[in-house]
């Protein structure tokens, strides 16, 4: 007779256990949560990331103001007139987003990434039982590295002179951090996805699809690449539109 102890231990695992083990044993987490929903983890991440987002609002608001000023200046240099009322309204909404954005953005992001995860799973050969619910559970756990990303932002806000920052990419952990913020916006956005935490999340999704969708381990990296490319579609579109318009 098989030993029921492992199953019992898995049933006793809490959401806190998941938040710890997703860093060290993601396969075990996805295996025991294969039939679980995503709502609880989505709520936890919304609260945690939202709280960190709120704590970093001073840094984020300053960076967003600088980014908007840079874009308005670039538009003026091209002969485009931006009404003062539009500038004031943009900064107002930027301030609201800098304070409360994550409380809305995290759940929406998880639901959208869940759709991308479902499509990725079908592309790499996930089984027929791999549906949106399972895919969104994987997507929710893939957001856990964003907690560390927000903590990294907090540290930078303490150690750096944020008054010199003119682009959000300058406080990111991506390749775009080291590039001129005035370069082609589409290319900058694309290189902004070459980011430690974005890549980490993509790999977690690949692992989740392999475990929950019952694909082979050899398909983890291809799945991670596909979901990364899905996320890069807006940047690629921006790059294409810029090329068609002749934008440098």
Regions found by a protein language model. Give the residues of each.
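A generic helix-loop boundary/linker signal
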Residues: 9, 16-17, 110, 199
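Selected alpha-helical membrane-embedding segments in polytopic membrane proteins
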Residues: 15, 28-148
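Membrane-interacting alpha-helical segments
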Residues: 12-34, 237, 241
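Low-complexity, intrinsically disordered extramembrane tails and loops of integral membrane proteins
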Residues: 1-13
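Short hydrophobic/aromatic-rich motifs at helix boundaries and adjacent loops
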Residues: 1, 88-93, 177-181
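Short N-terminal micro-motifs specific to bacterial/archaeal maturation
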Residues: 10-13, 20, 126, 211
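Membrane-cytosol interface at the C-terminal ends of transmembrane alpha helices
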Residues: 25, 110-125, 154, 199-212
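Hydrophobic alpha-helical transmembrane segments and adjacent short intramembrane/lumenal linkers
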Residues: 133-248
């Amino acid at each position: 007779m098989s030993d029921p102890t492992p199953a019992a231990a898995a049933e006793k695992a809490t959401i806190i256990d998941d938040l710890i083990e997703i860093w060290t044993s993601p396969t075990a987490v996805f295996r025991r949560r294969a039939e679980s929903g995503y709502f609880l983890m989505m709520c936890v991440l919304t609260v945690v990331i939202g709280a960190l987002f709120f704590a970093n609002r001073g840094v984020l608001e300053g960076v967003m103001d600088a980014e908007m000023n840079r874009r308005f200046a670039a538009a003026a240099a091209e002969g485009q007139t931006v009404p003062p009322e539009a500038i004031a309204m943009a900064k107002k909404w930027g301030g609201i987003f800098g304070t409360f954005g994550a409380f809305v953005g995290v759940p929406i992001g998880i639901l959208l990434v869940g759709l991308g995860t479902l499509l990725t799973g079908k592309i790499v050969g996930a089984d027929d039982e791999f549906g949106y619910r399972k895919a969104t559970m994987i997507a929710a756990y893939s957001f856990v590295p964003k907690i560390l990303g927000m903590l990294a932002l907090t540290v930078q806000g303490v150690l750096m002179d944020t008054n010199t920052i003119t682009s959000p990419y300058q406080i990111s952990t991506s390749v775009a951090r080291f590039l001129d913020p005035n370069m082609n916006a589409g290319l900058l956005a694309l290189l902004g996805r070459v980011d430690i935490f974005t890549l980490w999340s993509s790999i977690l999704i690949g692992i989740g699809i392999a475990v929950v969708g019952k694909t082979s381990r050899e398909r983890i990296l291809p799945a991670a690449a596909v979901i990364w490319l899905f996320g890069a579609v807006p940047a690629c579109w921006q790059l294409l539109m810029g090329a068609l318009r002749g934008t440098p």
